[in-house]
Amino acid sequence: MRASLSILVAFPALAAARDVVTIGMTGSWHPADVTEDNTKLLGTALSGSSFSKSVGDKRVCYSEVTSLETQVVAGTNYRFHISGCDVTDSDGECSTSALSSCELSGFVVQIFEQSWTNTLKVTNIKAEEAATASSSSTPAPTPASTSTSASSSEETMLQSSVQQRAMFSDFV
């Protein structure tokens, strides 16, 4: 009787936990709202000194953030779609002089943030056309090893479910 009562109590908790795992699943890109905070994050990253080697000497400034996508990994990847200028040195937002001497273009700026290690790094800067073509055929590189495949996502959910069941079995 006691065991069946424990199962009745644990089952709804497991069902709710499964929904949480599904909603917050790592690995896939999701549209996000452009906010003042994430726009400040973009400015801080572009004006900083932490750029991946793959970025090389490429620098951009932005006049507008047109859209944003995020990806949860061992931290957060941000994919900013911006209207901006190709520059030699960036302070984030385009200055008046930069805007007067360039033609605005679309760029995709990818940033990795890991708040608990104070990591903020620009990992990729591409022209919008090139970025659109490459992101549709090749998954974006991530600092942590994650997979966007369905089987990997299902495996992650299964592992979480098994861990949760093991946790609840201690109470039975």
From Swiss-Prot:
**Record's subcellular location:** Secreted
Q: Where is this site: Reactive site?
A: 27
SUPFAM superfamilies for this protein: Cystatin/monellin (SSF54403)
Keyword field contains Signal: yes
Q: Which residue stretches belong to region Disordered?
A: 129-172
> Which residues are the signal sequence here?
1-17
Q: Which domain of life is it from?
A: Eukaryota
Q: Where is the composition biased (Low complexity)?
A: 130-156
- Record-level GO cellular component terms: extracellular region
Q: Signal: is it a keyword of this entry?
A: yes
Summarize the record's induction comment.
Expressed during infection of host plant and non-sporulating growth, upon nitrogen starvation, in mating culture, in mycelium as well as in ungerminated sporangia.
Q: GO molecular function of the protein, one example?
A: cysteine-type endopeptidase inhibitor activity
Family matches, as Gene3D superfamilies: 3.10.450.10
Sorted UniProt keywords: Protease inhibitor, Secreted, Signal, Thiol protease inhibitor, Virulence
User: What residue intervals traverse the membrane?
Assistant: none
Q: Where does the motif Secondary area of contact lie?
A: 71-75
Give me the stretches of Polar residues compositional bias.
157-166
Functionally, this protein is described as follows: Secreted effector that interacts with and inhibits host apoplastic pathogenesis-related papain-like cysteine proteases. Inhibition of host proteases by a pathogen extracellular protease inhibitor forms a specific type of defense-counterdefense mechanism between plants and microbial pathogens.
Q: Which family does it belong to?
A: Belongs to the cystatin family.
User: What protein am I looking at?
Assistant: Cystatin-like cysteine protease inhibitor EPIC4
Q: Which organism is it from?
A: Phytophthora infestans (strain T30-4)
The UniProt gene name for this protein comes to EPIC4
